[in-house]
Design a protein with these regions (language model features):
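Short histidine-centered catalytic/ligand-binding loop motif
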Residues: 177, 187-192
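C-terminus-biased signal that marks the final domain/tail of proteins
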Residues: 1-78, 190-330
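Short, structured patches in soluble enzyme cores that scaffold and shape functional sites
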Residues: 94-96, 138-139, 158-162, 187, ...
Length: 330
């Protein structure tokens, strides 16, 4: 964390500047620095100690580290894909889009926070007894997991799900003392650490009460093991599975329920599905999926990076992205 403290301070300062734009008195930042830090003690081990460790290492106030971790629960706009080729091999990929409405830089024609997050992208290898448990692409300073692969078992990404009963409500309840819901990023990390199979991971993602609604995109190691789990904070609303016999050789999730049309100003789903259909199952691979995720507006000004994963041997690769103009802001 020490190596990334300058970059993390830049991002946290940006978040504070945005807060001060809406609340010029500075009271919001004061509350963050003086009140929210105490709530760290309400988090389960090891998350509470890790947040304190990051604060100590970076020199950033603990409350601001907590807020940095909260932001992922409510400001992400992503595209995730699980696809199976003709031989039964599974691929999992995602565009990580972050920073919606968090400061537009007119001079550089980009989202300020999106640009500042790119130096914080890290590839992590979580080990126990010198053996890899899982691998993940993540932000330095963020203790949850946004994506990961458990070698030879499963792959996992999460996308935010927009809902009236959304992350803001759950976070507010947490501040008020109701803490029976789990943070999305903490759940994905727990599943990557502890789940022993695709089915075990699927069950944990479907049944755990959440702080915010979410989509969990899960891939396994066997033919047909791939799904999108649509979650409210308290229940599973839908599970969309791969079904090769019925012609469903991929599942794709942006940030909208699959049975509803996407927002007209944010339709990444239709172009991505069109590209996948044109690619066809016999040509699907990590390079062709990368091409799909490079198609505008699937690739847009919010895109921080593209991550490609294959469950076999825990393969993962990540590319920082730039979307050349003309390019959609989201």
């Amino acid at each position: 964390m020490h190596d990334k403290k300058t970059e993390l301070k830049t991002v946290v300062q940006n978040i504070k500047d945005i807060a001060n734009t809406f609340f010029p008195s500075g009271k919001v930042v004061d509350i963050v620095d003086n009140k929210i830090a105490h709530l760290t003690a309400t988090l389960p081990y090891p998350f509470n100690e890790e947040l304190q460790g990051i604060a100590n290492s970076s020199g950033i106030p603990l409350g601001e580290i907590v807020i940095f971790n909260i932001f992922y629960e409510i400001f992400t706009v992503c595209t995730s894909i699980v696809a199976e080729d003709k031989t039964g091999k599974l691929y999992h990929a995602r565009n990580l889009d972050f920073g919606l409405f968090l400061g537009w830089d007119v001079k550089n024609n980009s989202w300020t926070l999106t640009r500042e997050l790119k130096p914080l992208v890290v590839n992590l290898d979580f080990q126990r007894n010198n053996k890899t448990v899982f691998k993940s692409t993540n932000f330095a300073g963020y203790i949850g997991m946004v994506s990961g692969v458990k070698p030879d078992l499963f792959t996992l990404t999460m996308n935010e799900r927009f809902s009236l009963d959304g992350g803001y409500v759950g976070i507010f309840e947490w501040f008020l003392g109701r803490r029976d819901g789990m943070w999305m990023g903490f759940l994905t990390r727990s599943v990557l650490e502890n789940a022993t199979s695709y089915q075990d991971a699927k069950e944990k993602l479907a049944k755990t009460r959440l702080l915010a609604p979410a989509y969990f995109i899960l891939g396994g190691k066997n033919s047909g093991e791939g799904c999108v789990i649509t979650r409210s904070r308290t229940a599973t609303l839908d599970i969309w599975d791969l079904d090769i016999k019925k012609g469903t050789w991929y599942v794709l999730e942006t940030n909208y329920d699959r049975w509803k049309p996407p927002l007209i100003l944010d339709n990444r789903r239709t172009p991505a599905m069109k590209c996948l259909n044109q690619t066809m199952q016999e040509n699907i691979s990590l390079p062709t999926i990368y091409d799909v995720l490079s198609t505008k507006p699937v690739l847009n000004k919010l895109t921080v990076c593209t991550t490609l994963m294959a469950v076999y041997n825990g393969h993962t690769e990540t590319y920082l992205r730039e979307c050349p103009d003309p390019c959609s802001p989201w």
